[in-house]
Amino acid sequence: MLLPASKTNLAASDERRRNKVTDFVQRILKSGVKFAAGSDMCWFYPGKTRGEATATMFPHLRDAGMPPLDILRAVTTNAAEMLGWQDRIGSVEPGKFADLIAVAGDPITDITELERVRFVMKGGQVIRNDIEQKHSK
């Protein structure tokens, strides 16, 4: 349980982190360097999984000036290329390993759609399928 003073400190800390992210992203965009992102760059979000925390980061990147398509590239193809694994991961192609999610809307139009995951496939196994449940009713 967090005491009220702790909640205030977390909010102030989150604001400082958001400001750092904004400054960092704006410098990246200005420099033109390729950017990769992943769950290891997310700050602490109480009660959220790494995936949820990563999706929570996307609006901050957008608000700092990064277009949604570039955000999606940062966590897929760019990350794979920077790891030197583009032949194995980073895009959906035959022979590549891919964990997949599905959302109802278009994340290029509204990046927060990635916070509303409806389907998850990890390692070839369906982990979550809210789409099938909705259609079977």
Predicted features, each with a name:
Residues 1, 46, 132-133:
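C-terminal cap/linker of serine protease catalytic domains
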Residues 1-2, 40, 123:
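Generic beta-structure capping elements
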Residues 5, 45-48, 111-112:
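Extracytoplasmic/secreted cell-surface and envelope-processing proteins
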Residues 14:
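Substrate-recognition/specificity elements adjacent to catalytic centers across diverse enzyme folds
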Residues 81, 94-136:
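C-terminal cap of metal-dependent C-N hydrolases
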